């Protein structure tokens, strides 16, 4: 073991890389350092928060709460062109099996209790993506007496995806933003 490794110098880029590096020589150096650590010691040290958040971001299971035409755009994100399945984002039909709810479409006053009930059935930790202008703030039907002016009045929303209807690319970008948010949060309650 060299003197630099014994004092911990030179390991900052390897051990505490906070941002994802683009492909290139910097990323190659980080990967080489990690694989070298594995071959020397047989293990890699990481914090539990980072490990758990890595698992959560790599296996999001969204449940569609499709209320209107935005739900059709959501289906496009799962088709072969974008294929969210290859990123570990597998759609689920049951709230008990999902950890992300995508609210897409106009939420009416009559449907609001059902949305809250489904949200309450989801296991912790759970996240909500509001997709489209109608789910974000009422959209075209904002002034109607029967429309909730944003699903954030019923459930807490983590990511808003704008558009009428938003494209599949916009939804995928919203999912990536949710993954960033999950990476930033702590998993262990410290008191």
Swiss-Prot record:
It is found in: Cell inner membrane. GO terms for biological process: aerobic respiration; electron transport coupled proton transport. GO terms for cellular component: plasma membrane; respiratory chain complex I. Keywords: 4Fe-4S, Cell inner membrane, Cell membrane, Iron, Iron-sulfur, Membrane, Metal-binding, NAD, Quinone, Translocase, Transport, Ubiquinone. Its cofactor is [4Fe-4S] cluster. Its main location: membrane. It is a peripheral membrane protein. It holds the Pfam family Oxidored_q6. NDH-1 shuttles electrons from NADH, via FMN and iron-sulfur (Fe-S) centers, to quinones in the respiratory chain. Couples the redox reaction to proton translocation (for every two electrons transferred, four hydrogen ions are translocated across the cytoplasmic membrane), and thus conserves the redox energy in a proton gradient. Belongs to the complex I 20 kDa subunit family. This is NADH-quinone oxidoreductase subunit B 2. It comes from Gluconacetobacter diazotrophicus (strain ATCC 49037 / DSM 5601 / CCUG 37298 / CIP 103539 / LMG 7603 / PAl5).
């Amino acid at each position: 073991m060299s003197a630099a490794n014994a004092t911990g110098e030179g390991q900052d880029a390897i051990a505490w890389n906070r941002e994802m590096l683009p492909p290139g020589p910097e990323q190659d150096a980080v990967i080489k350092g990690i694989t070298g650590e594995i071959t020397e010691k047989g293990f890699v040290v990481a914090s539990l928060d980072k490990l758990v958040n890595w698992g959560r971001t790599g296996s999001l299971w969204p449940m569609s709460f499709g209320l209107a035409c935005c739900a059709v755009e959501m289906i496009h994100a799962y088709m072969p062109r974008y294929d969210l399945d290859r990123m570990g984002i597998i759609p689920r039909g049951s709230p008990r099996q999902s950890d992300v709810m995508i609210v897409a479409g106009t939420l009416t006053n009559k449907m609001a209790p059902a949305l809250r009930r489904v949200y309450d059935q989801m296991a912790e930790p759970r996240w909500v993506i509001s997709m489209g202008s109608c789910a974000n703030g009422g959209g075209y039907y904002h002034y109607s007496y029967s429309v909730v002016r944003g699903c954030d009045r019923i459930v807490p929303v983590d990511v808003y995806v704008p558009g009428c209807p938003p494209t599949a690319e916009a939804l995928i970008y919203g999912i990536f933003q949710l993954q960033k948010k999950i990476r930033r949060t702590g998993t262990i309650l410290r008191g």
